[in-house]
Amino acid sequence: MATYKVTLISEEHDINTTIDCNDDVFVLDAAEEAGIDLPYSCRAGACSTCAGKVTEGTIDQSEQTFLDDDQMGAGFVLTCIAYPKSDCTILVHQEDELY
């Protein structure tokens, strides 16, 4: 099991925090454990409430069913089903940016 540094950023919500996240823990769950309040709804990768955008690093979100190829290609990720695969930076609170 690897542990990665995940940096979560939202200027609008005054978030700029780096957390430790194991490669078998969803980013949303690790953020909650660290006391960071991120938006979520379904927790199953089937909506866009928890959307973020990866600006650096690699994420495994193979369990998601909502985002299309273009959105994923642009770096969008659903934090509720996203596992880190490297140290990474994620802009959070990005649901409005999807559309």
From Swiss-Prot:
GO cellular component: chloroplast
Cofactor(s) of this protein: [2Fe-2S] cluster
Pfam family, any one: Fer2
Location in the cell: Plastid, Chloroplast
Subunit structure and binding partners: Forms a complex with heterodimeric ferredoxin-thioredoxin reductase (FTR) and thioredoxin.
Family from the record: Belongs to the 2Fe2S plant-type ferredoxin family.
Protein name listed in UniProt: Ferredoxin
Gene source species: Thalassiosira weissflogii (Marine diatom)
Gene responsible for this protein: petF
